[in-house]
């Protein structure tokens, strides 16, 4: 059964998609967000929820979680005209009478216009690649950190040597009972200053070691077995929680099936963010044009233009003059 028609469907529930949905609500149209993950917020919420962001206008600094919470709160003003679909991956969309048919892995949706704000595509964590790892995931094995306080008083082991691994280790030093970092190389890939802080901290550093096995009972991991690189030495580390910080891999395989014009892994757009298909627009990291600057702030600026152009496309005979928000909201 085909879904009811929405004015604008936004593919992607990251910061840019959320702000585009808010602005569409401000303009009085109905909006649907289709997000492939189980939560809104995109990369700031998933990849660096506790890290500080410094380039959002009017905020000297805020975390990825705070940014996401603010955007969701802002959007909630128009919850009566906004529908959110989580854990749905857009496979294809086709032009039909009056708009577009959008097919996901779960359903068929209908929209009069589409705004693509899916960033660099769907992403997933790089895992340890060990047997039984999936059994412990999201119980006491984590690929990203949402709340530091959940590790209070625990023995925490962190695998990884990049910025996130080092930042989490330093942040947990005064919260956890103990913090141990396992890295396959002697040298870390994180910022030099952070590495110096790590080396002078109370964090235990085990290098160069690689994970070999996980031991546990039920859904809880209890020990991580590691082996020294190019040696036979094996250690068993007792733990309460394990954080795997090997980064995330992105995939835009479905994007290539959308029959648009592309520049490398992004969608080519006009100065008004129109793609090669009329009625379909792209913003944020998903959009490519000359002089593009891949910042969240840039995407925030692109969103109103794309929304206004989508409204002009849907309702060409309507008076679509842009009015400031101070005149629209009491």
From Swiss-Prot:
It comes from Streptococcus pyogenes serotype M5 (strain Manfredo). Belongs to the ferredoxin--NADP reductase type 2 family. Its cofactor is FAD. This is Ferredoxin--NADP reductase. The keyword Oxidoreductase applies. FAD binds at residues 35, 43, 48, 90, 123, 285, 326. One of its GO terms (molecular function) is NADP binding. InterPro entries: FAD/NAD-bd_sf, FAD/NAD-binding_dom, Fd--NADP_Rdtase_type_2, Ferredoxin-NADP_redctase_2. It is an enzyme of class 1 (oxidoreductase). Keywords: FAD, Flavoprotein, NADP, Oxidoreductase. Its EC number is 1.18.1.2. SUPFAM superfamilies: FAD/NAD(P)-binding domain (SSF51905). PANTHER family: THIOREDOXIN REDUCTASE 1-RELATED-RELATED (PTHR48105). Homodimer. It catalyses: 2 reduced [2Fe-2S]-[ferredoxin] + NADP(+) + H(+) = 2 oxidized [2Fe-2S]-[ferredoxin] + NADPH. Binds 1 FAD per subunit.
